[in-house]
């Protein structure tokens, strides 16, 4: 739930990137159809925010997300995640799972494909549990 203390870092039709006051970056997908340029721009801003924050923690809210297309999956696997780990310091991803089962499957395929990257993903049904896990990782890191 967004409130006035959240700092929106970037927003387009794909979703919203927020510098969460609890101490991590937050990516929230919208349910709209994604255009490649907008998708790439959106994820690029996530990378920049993570690099600026330097804590390696990202809350990924996929509740309203539609499934990744094959091209989106390739982009995330081959370009965005490796770059965000290297340039953004991405280490911990707390994913609030999508309502759409096909979106869940698409995300699982991405995570399986990048399991060699030095990062951890955990899936959650509830936002509060995702936040608690992410903050715990931050304290441990």
What are these regions (language model features)?
Residues 1-141:
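Amphipathic, Lys/Arg-enriched alpha-helical "gate/interface" segment within cytosolic domains
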């Amino acid at each position: 739930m967004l409130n006035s203390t959240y700092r929106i870092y970037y927003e387009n039709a794909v979703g919203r990137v927020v510098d969460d006051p609890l101490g991590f970056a937050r990516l929230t997908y919208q349910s709209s159809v994604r255009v490649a340029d907008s998708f790439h721009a959106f994820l690029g801003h996530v990378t920049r925010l993570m690099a600026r924050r330097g804590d390696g923690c990202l809350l990924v809210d996929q509740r309203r997300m539609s499934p990744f297309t094959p091209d989106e999956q390739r982009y995330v696997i081959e370009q965005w995640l490796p770059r965000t780990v290297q340039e953004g310091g991405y280490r911990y991803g707390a994913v609030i799972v999508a309502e759409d089962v096909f979106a869940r499957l698409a995300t699982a395929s991405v995570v399986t494909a990048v399991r060699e990257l030095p990062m951890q993903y955990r899936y959650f049904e509830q936002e509060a549990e995702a936040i608690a896990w992410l903050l715990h990782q931050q304290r441990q890191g």
